[in-house]
Amino acid sequence: MTSSTSPETPSDPSQTRYKRVMLKISGEALMGDQGFGLHPPTVKRIAHEIKTVHDMGVEICMVIGGGNIFRGLSGAAQGMERTTADYMGMLATVMNALGMQAALEGLGVFTRVISAIRMDEVAEPYIRRRAVRHLEKKRVCIFAAGTGNPYFTTDTAATLRANEMACEAIFMGKNGVDGVYDKDPALHDDAVRYDEISYDEVLAKRLKVMDASAIALARDNNLPLIVFSLDTAGGFRGILAGEGTYTKVQG
């Protein structure tokens, strides 16, 4: 499916669908065609997509996974203590957050990295009221180190912070897929994309959108989830302007 062309970019948030949003992307999204780490041109491209939305006047929160560097579950599966592996994964998210901060500020977007684990030399500690103030000053807030606790994914961290920051929706940017499908479109040519689906259906059908804890937290707080493709230039901005291809999960 192809997305329609975006209209002229709105100059203020009153002309967009949402005024404050949470953007969740995986660490793997920063790898580009590499097998590990950060690919600077890819990070810069994603930063540019974020800047175009920031320029619309939208207040942006962000959570980035750490799977391009280390994934806690994988470490635990190989015999590492789960708690230690999860903390290592949290540190990986801080590295990704700093990389994205550098890319955004290189484009002139003021940014704050806010860590759930104190590391004052590189990031601010998480204080909700301070983070809200950053958003009001039009700074992008990148929340790092998950929730600060093992056994919780970055999907859950994104949903938690979205609720705490009073975001109006979570935008989940995906690679290679433009929404939620009834089965894996990479393996099944007859896979069908949902335009809209409820959280209960996602859980009942075991669709791989977010982990169950994150889905329950979003559902119980009436927080919609927009799943879209990060690969489409202008896709993030287009959806906020009311266009594009995506799946909306709510209810």
Swiss-Prot record:
GO terms for biological process: 'de novo' CTP biosynthetic process; UDP biosynthetic process. One of its GO terms (molecular function) is ATP binding. Keywords: Allosteric enzyme, ATP-binding, Cytoplasm, Kinase, Nucleotide-binding, Pyrimidine biosynthesis, Transferase. Allosterically activated by GTP. Inhibited by UTP. It is found in: Cytoplasm. Pathway: Pyrimidine metabolism; CTP biosynthesis via de novo pathway; UDP from UMP (UMPK route): step 1/1. Its EC number is 2.7.4.22. InterPro entries: AceGlu_kinase-like_sf, Asp/Glu/Uridylate_kinase, Uridylate_kinase, Uridylate_kinase_bac. It catalyses: UMP + ATP = UDP + ADP. Residues 32-37 are annotated as: Involved in allosteric activation by GTP. Pfam families: AA_kinase. ATP binds at K24, I25, S26, G27, G67, R71, N175, Y181, D184. UMP binds at G66, D86, T147, G148, N149, P150, Y151, F152, T153, T154. One of its GO terms (cellular component) is cytoplasm. Catalyzes the reversible phosphorylation of UMP to UDP. Belongs to the UMP kinase family. Homohexamer. This is Uridylate kinase. It comes from Ruegeria pomeroyi (strain ATCC 700808 / DSM 15171 / DSS-3).
